[in-house]
Amino acid sequence: MLFMVIYTWEPGQRNELVRRRIEKGKLIREGVKVLGEWTDLGGGRAFSLVESNDAKSFMSGTNRWGDLMKVEAVPVIDTEELMKWAKGRKKA
């Protein structure tokens, strides 16, 4: 399953976030694969696309950052995959 993860933080948290990320890395749990990461150039927000078959393990990993930022995880699907599924349903 794919998740789009949105991280938001207050300006005063930036330095601690950078320090922790440099020192400890991504803090990703076993069974979770990071497919991409992007940072908002305006600051205060970043995005990750991750894949995991175990939502509980994935979500427990996001808690490691909860003291510094808000973490939202949204289950997503590739649009082309969804369109193929919808097309098949329409015929049925």
Stretches found by the model and what they are:
Residues E51-S52, R64:
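Conserved catalytic core of Hanks-type protein kinase domains
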